[in-house]
Amino acid sequence: MEVSSELLSNGWTSWQRVLLTASLLTCWLLPITAGVTIESVPPKLVEGENVLLRVDNLPENLRVFVWYRGVTDMSLGIALYSLDYSTSVTGPKHSGRETLYRNGSLWIQNVTREDTGYYTLQTISKNGKVVSNTSIFLQVNSSLFICGRPSPPALLTIESVPASVAEGGSVLLLVHSLPDNLQSLLWYKGLTVFNKVEIARHRTVKNSSEMGPAYSGREIVYSNGSLLLQNVTWEDTGFYTLQIVNRYWKMELAHIYLQVDTSLSSCCDDFNSVQLRINPVPPHAAEGERVLLQVHNLPEDVQTFLWYKGVYSTQSFKITEYSIVTESLINGYAHSGREILFINGSLLLQDVTEKDSGFYTLVTIDSNVKVETAHVQVNVNKLVTQPVMRVTDSTVRIQGSVVFTCFSDNTGVSIRWLFNNQNLQLTERMTLSPSKCQLRIHTVRKEDAGEYQCEAFNPVSSKTSLPVRLTVMNE
């Protein structure tokens, strides 16, 4: 932006001279606070987007206003605007992406992480006095940002696929939220971590796997952490533990309880067919719903059954205990008042919350004082709220680029993208951020024109954003 000849003739030939003149005219050390306000539009930013630092309540009778980086250092000037001459002068911190408007607002295009920081607007009156100094902090988040708000580290979880497997079948223990800085991962049979029960380990740096003492020859460990169990038997029922180690030697554990459904088995072994088993109905529940922990194959001569919250059958975790002989019910420390116990051993959880997620344990005792134990995992999620989608520019030229960003107020959700009400088919010109909340089209083509939406979902619900139409223009 060039300075007018009239302005130049008055001696405003450089940014440094402008700042010197302003500093001589103003009482810099004692600025007057006025009612000027600055708002970031939009308030949340991801790399590649544009932002308007919108100014309101600009004082009257101003001569100039100045934008600069930081709070007090005027040598970090971005641009100065002379209201007398309706002309702006760029400063040393002007990157070529900033546009200064007569109303004081500053437009910054294609922001990067380096644009994060304080921005200050100084206004100067016609008599050369500082009227106001107003600052705003601009936060630019990278593509690793969970769009909408910084997300706590995702919890390492394991899912059984399928949820129930018959003897002779295969099951995948699918790992979710594996960290990027992974060094190694180890699988164990049971809840404890020691060498004797190690199934296998995988080193990501070498992309190599080693089998442990508990390896049966039927397991395959994958680089994404998942474990495939083939030709399962009822003896494979039980807990499995995944241990991960990152490059900073920080360890994390996750557990899953595998149930082998012997009732689906083609064999006719009566012993296998009476194995105690629990199914959560439904497998995934929304907050406020009910979950029935449905018991199968309860021993015929059972005398007592006990329910516990967690995997350990100790008094502090006891929910309830029922004696069939005396028809007596005793609630434990972990009883919340929302549980209903049925005479077939099943337990109903009412008005569940996310805190009810986790393992539950059933212990049965028969007339011969034989004890059987079974475990079940409960999964409770919040209902998803509607996400909001933004685009850097809804009208782009062919060969240009555009960034769509999906903002969700929910944590633990997944994101998928829709194009003209269909699942978006990614091309080599498109990239997704690691969390999939940001979609970038690098070289736009005519066929990219249309309506884009993002969908936020978890196992119990999903919501789709309002559509944003992209218009593609010829060069």
From Swiss-Prot:
Residues glycosylated per entry: N103, N110, N231
Domain of life the protein comes from: Eukaryota
Any one Gene Ontology BP term: positive regulation of transforming growth factor beta production
Iron-sulfur found in the keyword field: no
Keyword Glycoprotein recorded: yes
Domain Ig-like V-type, residue spans: 44-140, 162-260, 280-380
Keywords annotated in UniProt: Angiogenesis, Disulfide bond, Glycoprotein, Immunoglobulin domain, Pregnancy, Secreted, Signal
InterPro entries for this protein: CEA_cell_adhesion, Ig-like_dom, Ig-like_dom_sf, Ig-like_fold, Ig_sub, Ig_sub2, Ig_V-set
GO MF assignments: syndecan binding
All copies of domain Ig-like C2-type, residue ranges: 387-471
Known role: May have an angiogenic function during early placental development. Binds to cell-surface heparan sulfate proteoglycans (HSPGs), and stimulates secretion of the proangiogenic factors VEGFA and TGFB from uterine dendritic cells and natural killer cells. Also induces endothelial tube formation in vitro.
Name this polypeptide is given: Pregnancy-specific glycoprotein 22
Gene behind the chain: Psg22
